[in-house]
Structures are given as C-alpha cells and as structure tokens.
C-alpha cells in the first residue's frame, strides 16, 4: 500500500481582503496628507492676508497697518507693522527653540527681557493664538515724551516660538488693542 503525501493547503488569499487592506491604507495615507496640508498651511492659506512673512512663517490680515520692513534698507530683526495715524506698532519675531524648550521657557525669557530696567510687567494671562497655547502680559514704558503701553504675546508651535508685541501711546492703546486682537484672530502659520 502506497501512502500518498498530500501537501497541506497554504493560506488562502481573498481578493476581497486584499482590496479592503489596500483601500484602508489609501484612506490612512489621504488622512495623513490632509493633516499635513492643514498643519503646514496649504496653497492659498494666505490669500486673504495683507501681511505675509516667509521669514517668520506666518500671515495675517492687518488692514490699515503698513509693513515697514519693505520700506527700510536694513534688515530688521523683526517684522514691524505701523499704524500711520498715530505710529502705533506691532512687532513680530520668531526664534528656533532648543530641544526640550517650550512655552514656559519662552515666557520666562521674554518677561525677563521686558522687566529689565525696572519695568513692572503685568500678570501672565493664558490664551490661544491660531489654535496653540499662548501667554500674554502688559507693561508700560515711561521713557520718552509719551507714555507707551505694551501688550506682549508669546506662543510656540513645533520647534519655533513667536513673540508678538503691540506698542501704542496710553491714550490710544484700547483702540489699537481691538485692532491687535483682530490681527491675532487672523494669524495663520505658513
């Protein structure tokens, strides 16, 4: 009697399962691409903005404010918007963070700079700008002929930190503050 060896059946492959797996992977990939475009800002993200900064990676709508960087022959360490009516300014700068640095480190460093020369810096108020946690505080500058009020806001996204500062004379500060908040509401990362 001869025993015939029969090879065990291998796993069967279903065309339906393969299609489902490939479709699932394609959907996941599309989700990653969509999230990346949203996170980085896709084409046209700054179409409604009046100010766009490739250097510091943002765009905002700031009607009535002029970007002074385009009018100066020297490179400023910040972007500066000016309101011609009263010379109020918004200064915007960004820095690369060291590994492990976060919002608390940026807040401490910025407040240390602001409080030099005996300037009294107000309490930190937590808020959000463009969907990321931010911190703000106010202080007054008495040097010069006109007392100046300053609102400073810092926030972190990824490995970069932004410092945005409104400076206006005390009499017009509240008016400019409303415009400043409008500008911040339009903040878009590029």
Question: At which residue positions do the language-model features occur?
Answer:
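N-terminal targeting sequences that direct proteins away from the cytosol to non-cytosolic compartments
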Residues: 1-85, 143-146, 168-190
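Conserved polar/disulfide-associated segments of primarily extracytoplasmic proteins
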Residues: 71-163, 167-174
């Amino acid at each position: 009697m001869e025993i015939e060896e029969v090879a065990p059946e291998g796993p069967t492959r279903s065309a339906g399962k393969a299609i489902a797996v490939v479709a699932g992977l394609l959907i996941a990939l599309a989700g990653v691409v969509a999230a990346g475009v949203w996170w980085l800002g896709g084409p046209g993200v700054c179409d409604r903005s009046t100010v766009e900064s490739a250097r510091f990676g943002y765009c905002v709508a700031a009607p009535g404010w002029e970007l002074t960087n385009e009018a100066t022959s020297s490179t400023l360490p910040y972007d500066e918007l000016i309101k011609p009516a009263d010379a109020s300014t918004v200064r915007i700068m960004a820095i690369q963070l060291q590994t492990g640095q976060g919002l608390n480190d940026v807040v401490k460093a910025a407040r240390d700079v602001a409080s030099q020369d005996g300037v009294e810096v107000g309490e930190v108020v937590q808020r959000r700008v463009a969907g990321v946690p931010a911190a703000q505080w106010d202080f007054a500058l008495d040097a010069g002929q006109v007392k100046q009020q300053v609102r400073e806001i810092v926030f972190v996204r990824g490995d970069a930190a932004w410092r945005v500062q409104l400076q206006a004379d005390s009499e017009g500060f509240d008016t400019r503050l409303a415009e400043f908040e409008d500008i911040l509401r339009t903040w878009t990362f590029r």
